[in-house]
């Protein structure tokens, strides 16, 4: 699965390009 941020499921891409968990 590829998302816009390239992060794993349950993670969001932040403005600085990192992935952070949404929980």
From Swiss-Prot:
GO terms for molecular function: cytokine activity. It comes from the Eukaryota. Hemolymph. Disulfide bonds join 7-19. Keywords: Cytokine, Disulfide bond. GO terms for cellular component: extracellular space. Causes rapid, rigid paralysis when injected into Lepidopteran larvae. The physiological role may be to reduce hemolymph loss following injury and promote wound healing. Belongs to the GBP/PSP1/paralytic peptide family. This is Paralytic peptide 2.
């Amino acid at each position: 699965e590829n998302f816009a941020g390239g992060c794993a499921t349950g993670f969001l891409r932040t403005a600085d390009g990192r992935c952070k968990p949404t929980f």
